[in-house]
Regions:
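NTP-dependent small-molecule kinase module
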Residues: 1, 109, 113, 130, ...
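ATP-dependent NMP and nucleoside kinases share a basic, alpha-helical "lid"
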Residues: 85-132
Length: 691
């Protein structure tokens, strides 16, 4: 008896390409494993024998193989229409079984993974008849009727771990193999396949030019369904402060999509992830941060020589606040995904300090073609006409992005928000918390045809440039952010940094008044107290995975000025302990303490009661998880989420909030959320809803 094998079933209707997929997948897996392959077509007892064949397959093939025994079974003689010879299928490290019914209900308890292959009916019929010729044609309808009868009571696609739209273009085996190592039941056996990605090399090109970032992104990724632009849109202002904290945060911009050989996308909702690679989609039931720990954190590539950035390709996107269910908070749902990420096997990185563009691509058959196209796009975006063309498409420097200003509604009226402030102060007085970061949500619906999310973002980045601005497109979901706040950075060498913002004043057009507002913020005892409480919280969060004694506060209650606000910012640094999980270190700090209050866990429970609804992406995080183990994440504030509902409308949501302490004045706190919303609302021509 051999050890119990990993058994992968490939199921689907006749003509879906199961046999070819199984053969190709087995060939690829044999690079690292012993693989046995079984075809159900060898065991069906005739053209009306689907159900009997499934029973025979489970009893005589799956049962013994699942125990690690050889399977002895009776084949079917299709020419003479009766039982044929006795055959043996030997156990192996991996067994692939394919055919209609391979993943039937009776079989699933013995399977490690289920792949469902599908194709349009006309493609399936043509493929099956081309393969089997005239022998099959008289029986097509009879066999198809059996399939439909079986599937009416056994919804195999619903139980599939991987679904593949087999287009017969040769892409299915590679796409499926990208996803199989993510399945928990297969991960141990397929560790060589996952490790193989860590041996990939990065090809780089440095171009000494300053392309217009918006023109370049639009040229390369304007038609991509899934694309990310981490946009240091205040780079020109920050560059005037060489060597400053602001200049360091604003040095690099990153843009990428999920196309190409290595491209993937991932969406997570309530403990379940959906991963896509080309024509294949996998469903993985696993907490997000546990999944992240399997795909990121162990350095998979080395930083290319001469390349100054920390991002060396990997995952980019956003994490929603409701992931707090995995870090000590309660379980709530949100209308938008809890996480949306792409895996970029190629990207453009702009170094604003040096005035260069870097092209990065994992080695792949399509790398040369992409590098050539990206090089041409960078050169075109460096021409004098590029910025003017983008500005014209956006309707001017501060152009209106909607024909009519949207009317926003608030989850809380002014009266309700002030009552919630009082309730938060009651919790503080009772000793249940020290600080409560109370938030609300503004929302509006507009005709989808009247709003171009790309133009909306261009207007936002001009109106309110920020070091952690970003534009994320995930199908019908768009994120347009002008965040000034870093949540957490972990460098490839393990250096950790958090830079919480607590304390906000509006900017004024009059220089004297503006300077006075900045001075008032710097001197505010209330704002300093709020900031210092969050600094203490983040010192604690970082300490869980930091080298003892390495946690330091290098900047306390400094004032930074942006286009529409002054902010109070602190900096906490630490060194990650060698061997610690980077994903767990991120989870230990999530969500950002500046968006919860302190102590974090009990305050999140208070917020759940007070706020009465999910926050979604707001107060989550936006950034990257790089193949060299680095991450840089911003807090998702000053962030407009645009969700195309599919009914011809688009819902706009904007979260705003502020820290409530015992000294808070309700009217001042309400004015603060108006100030924070102003940059986004004014760009849309909208007003704060004061009802």
């Amino acid at each position: 008896m051999s050890p119990a094998p990993v058994i992968i079933a490939i199921d689907g209707r006749s003509g879906a390409g199961k046999t070819t997929l199984a053969v190709e997948l087995a060939a690829r897996l044999r690079a690292h494993h012993r693989v046995s392959l079984f075809h159900l077509e060898d065991i069906y007892p005739g053209w009306n024998g689907l159900m009997v064949g499934i029973d025979r397959y489970v009893a005589t093939v799956l049962e013994p193989l699942s125990r690690g025994d050889a399977a002895t079974w009776t084949s079917w003689d299709w020419q003479n229409h009766y039982d044929g010879d006795s055959r043996v299928t030997l156990p192996a490290e991996i067994v692939i079984v394919e055919g209609v019914g391979a993943a039937a209900a009776a079989a699933r308890r013995l399977l490690s993974a289920v792949i469902w292959a599908d194709s349009p009916e006309e493609v399936r019929r043509t493929r099956a008849l081309d393969r089997d010729g005239g022998t099959y044609e008289p029986y097509w309808d009879q066999w198809a009727a059996q399939e439909e009868e079986w599937l009416r009571t056994d919804d195999v696609p619903q139980h599939a771990d991987v679904r593949v739209l087999n287009r017969a273009d040769g892409s299915a085996p590679a796409d499926v193999l990208q996803l199989l190592p993510y399945l928990p039941a297969l991960a141990p056996a397929l560790s060589p396949e996952l490790s193989a990605r860590r041996g990939l090399s990065i090809r780089t090109e440095q171009l000494d030019t300053r392309p217009d970032p918006a023109a370049l992104f639009n040229s390369l990724y304007g038609t991509s369904a899934n694309a990310v632009w981490l946009d240091s849109s205040n780079a020109s202002q920050a560059g005037d402060q060489a060597g400053s904290e602001a200049a360091g945060r604003s040095r690099f911009s990153i843009m990428a999509d999920d196309a190409g050989t290595h491209g993937q996308s991932m969406t997570h909702r309530s403990g379940q992830s959906e991963l896509r690679a080309g024509c294949a989609t996998a469903t993985v039931a696993r907490p997000f941060f546990r999944w992240l720990d399997t795909v990121w954190g162990n350095p998979a590539v080395s930083t290319p020589e001469g390349y100054p950035g920390e991002f060396t390709l990997g995952w980019l996107g956003c994490l929603g606040y409701e992931l707090k269910r995995e870090t000590g908070g309660s379980d709530h749902s949100a209308p938008t995904p809890d996480a949306s990420l792409i895996f970029a096997g190629r990207a453009v990185v702009l170094d604003h300090a040096e005035g260069t563009a870097w092209l990065l691509a994992l080695d792949a058959p399509d790398a040369d073609e992409w590098l050539e196209g990206a090089r041409a796009a960078v050169e075109a975006a460096s021409g004098p006409a590029a910025p003017a063309a983008v500005a014209a498409r956006a309707g001017g420097s501060n152009g209106v992005v909607l024909p009519e200003a949207p009317t926003f509604q608030s989850r809380d009226t002014a009266k309700q928000y002030r009552e919630k402030i009082a309730a938060a102060q009651h919790e503080i007085a009772e000793g249940n918390t020290y600080e409560v970061c109370l938030t609300t949500t503004l929302s509006a619906k507009v005709p989808a045809a009247t709003l171009d999310p790309w133009q909306a973002y261009l207007a936002l980045r001009r109106r309110n440039p920020a070091p952690f601005a970003s534009y994320l497109a995930f199908g019908g979901l768009t994120v347009a952010s002008t965040s000034p706040e870093r949540f957490l950075k972990i460098a490839s060498d393990g250096g950790m940094r958090a830079e919480p913002i607590k304390g906000t004043r509006r900017r004024a057009a009059d220089p004297h008044e503006d300077a006075q507002l900045r001075t008032d913020l710097a001197a505010s005892l209330k704002d300093r107290a709020e900031n210092i409480m969050i600094v203490d919280l983040l010192r604690n969060d970082l300490s869980h995975f930091a080298v003892p004694g390495s946690v330091t506060v290098s900047r306390l209650c400094a004032i930074e000025s942006y286009a529409t606000v002054h902010q109070m910012v602190s900096t906490i640094d630490a060194q990650l302990q060698r061997g610690s999980s980077r994903a767990e270190a991120v989870a230990a700090c999530f969500p950002a303490g500046s968006m919860t209050g302190a102590p974090k866990i009990s305050t999140m429970a208070i917020l759940d009661r007070l706020e009465g609804g999910g926050r979604g992406l707001y107060s989550g995080a936006i950034g990257y998880f790089s193949l060299n183990g680095a991450t840089d994440l911003a807090v998702a504030i000053r962030t407009l989420v645009i969700d195309a509902a599919g009914d011809g409308t688009a819902e706009l949501t904007l979260g705003v909030g502020g820290a409530i302490t015992a000294d808070s004045v309700p009217e001042d706190e309400y004015e603060e959320i108006r100030t924070k919303a102003f940059g986004v609302l004014s760009t849309l021509g909208a007003d704060f809803p004061d009802a």
